[in-house]
Amino acid sequence: MKNIGIYAGILLLFVVLAYSFTPQVLDGKIVNQSDIASWKGMANEAVTHNTANPDDPTAWTNSMFGGMPTTATIDDFDGDWTDAIYKFLLTGRRPASYLLIALIGGFLLMLSMGTSRLIAVAGAVAIAFCSYNMQIIQVGHNTKMQAIAYFPWVLAGVIFTYRMAMRLPVAAGNDAKGDWKTWLPKTILGATLFAFALSFQIKANHPQITYYLAIVIFAYAIGQFIYLCINKDKRFLLRNFFIASALLLVIGTVGIATNANKLIPTYKYTPYTMRGGSELTSDSDSHNSKGLDLDYATAWSYGIGEMPNLLIPNFNGGASAGELPLDSETGKLLKRAGQPNLKQTMKHLPLYWGPQPFTAGPMYMGAITIFLFVLGLILCKGREKWWLVAASVIAVFLAWGSHFMWFTRLWFDYAPMYSKFRTVSMALIVLQTTMPLLGFYVLDRILKERYDKQALKKAGFIAYGITAGFCLLCTLMPGIAGSFVSSSDAGMSDIIVDALAADRATLLKKDAIRSLVLISCVFALILWAFRTPKTDAVGKDGSFVLKGRTVIVAAAVVLLVWFDLFSVGKRYLNKSHFITPKDFTAHYEPRLVDEVIHQDEDPDYRVLDLSVNTFNDAIQSYHHKCIGGYSPVKLQRYQDLIERYIAPEIKSFYGMADGAVTISEIEENLTELKVISMLNGKYIIVDPGAAPVYNRYAYGNCWFVDSFVPAVTPDEEIALLASTDLRTTAVIGNDFPAAQSFFAAAQKDTDDALGASGCHPESSEGSPDRITLTSYAPNELRYDFSTDSERAAIFSEIYYPEGWKAWIEPAGTYGEVRGGHYIPTENAKQIDLFRADWMLRGAILPEGEGELIMRFEPDSYQLGENISRASSIFLILLLIASAAGVAASASASRLSRKGSTR
């Protein structure tokens, strides 16, 4: 009961710490997150539809890039029973709830390593409050933050499982076959808890963080295996190691499978995205046909020279848009120059001068954490160090990216799935766990007097000399950091650059002094604690209990770590970043141009918004079905289309607009925007406060074509768009032989008719055949058509093979939608869609009148839901059974002890 009270108190402390960092959430305010604003923009169409049609939710949106699956946007999937637990853990005001989850996970991880509770609290604070977490919260990378928050939970499950399996009450060489009751129940429980934690971590939906987590897990498992192999007296535990490994693998797979409702659709979608690579062969040497372009993936590589940021937050200036006081050199200069809005200007200065394009801030791990980590490298021996060192080194090498290209290319070309990821500097999040874990593990052992006094002093002064000595050196000679000049300074006058450089040097010196003081305080506390006489510090249960000065030291370290990370974190997430929900919705207030466009009653057309960053802005998608948008997982064929045609056509449009006097004059000259018109780009926004440019040449929702041009390769297929009249002729790739055969047969009939009559048959433009869009929903399109013969229709809709289905219904009829699936009438016929004009949908329509129904119903969703449901039910039952097994084993053990004492 006493322990329950202690843990409840620690939980309450974590709640206080989380909410004290973001007290604004208690007033109902939210973080003004740019990425969340973008998410609401890209998700608005799907969310609106799903709210109005809960029985027929959409997995497709036309709001950006012509249309794409919502797999990476909407996470409202059915089937997973563990999702309720996941959402319960997120109870509370965000982002405080994210910090609370990270604190609890860090605490559990430290306990799994055998640390005392007070040191575990310090380690939890060090893990949860790293400055990078605050930066990603501020910009809105919520899924990344959730994935990082569950990182220590998963690792704690792994460590607990192996420790339970290998903590036997028998000596080496004894028969261990009959002692399974002492370790197997807890091992199964540990593996089950690991599976739950892994399930939650994957639910956060950030595969790159999960990938880094897998590296750490493998490092730990391999480290334990090597330890058992090289120690003869421990080899008898290899059996338990393999059993624990098998349990983690099997039960962990079940945990992963609870997310099948999300993973399977994502697995199906990824090969078609930018992360699946381009089919084109004419790209640069850095192109990876099975993943992202190498230059694109490594654009954000952490500089080798900026690694001291881990110890000194402003070593490279901090953030790309940072704040300086008015009495700084830059402030004085701008004040003398009469800079308007000086106070506002001083809040957004280019202070970062490192090699990355720009950054929200440094990967500051905490001066105290770095000192303790270095101390651990020197003092700690054996298995608890080397797996952490290995994981940390791999993470650092990966984060260096383009600055350590041979290693990066090795992983990019040969490591499974690694080529799907970008922003490689993110790998340093591994250090947010490994560094505190080793550092505070060693501090715990120091306070438990596990080290020789002389060895501790020697190691302590070496670690102090390395860390505090470097800080002192930066204070006295800041020039060792570099020139304090950034490549982004090139457009500024020399006098401003000189002022900025002076201020950057000042920032470095101040933070170097700050880190020096913090390290000195902790080292002094350690020396003070170690000077005390050895006392009896063993509890009733045989565990070590901190007493006397050690308690004071541990508590002081908790406070110092909190102060260190709290104060730096506030630089990147503070009250200025919080706004009311009402103010947040102002992002989506319709502009004048939006209101004009909304007057169009056509249910399906596209808008090209040039008043924003067209292909890096998703807020435009809140109001319109856009040709642009923002998504790191857009369809690769669409990205190819942007690069080959849409971007050049936009450039051509600007050229026309520059020479025009009126909007009407611009509209007259839009005939060259072939691909934009093919995508039914009906409106072009230039000025948000004026009427849009109307593209009268847009092809519309659908049209008939009479002929085709075959393309043998993807390169030929995309190139033919330039030379083909897409209104009358379709470009068809060789991967659609049935469509090519239809066109070939139709062309033969045309030639035969020409030979028999001596004149051409009636063209499409003069034909009475018609096709009209009659109903629009993001996941369903209905068309009414009438033809005198079989005809090929092309639709200004994006082709995607994994889910779009089509039926021909008799004229005036429609089946029913049941459980999100279309049930056709008995007279309906399902037909195949084909890809035309690089990425549009095409269909062969029968002779006569009828209704064409297109619906997005990917089979992967139903399969995923079934697997998720079965896996989550099994996992919940296994948790109950394993917990009951541990309780029964503990009860039997107590009865056995009572019997032996009688």
Identify what each model region corresponds to.
Residues 139-150, 161-165, 187-199, 207-252, ...:
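Contiguous transmembrane helix-bundle modules in multi-pass membrane proteins
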Residues 14-103, 109, 125-137, 141-149, ...:
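Membrane-interface coil-to-helix junctions
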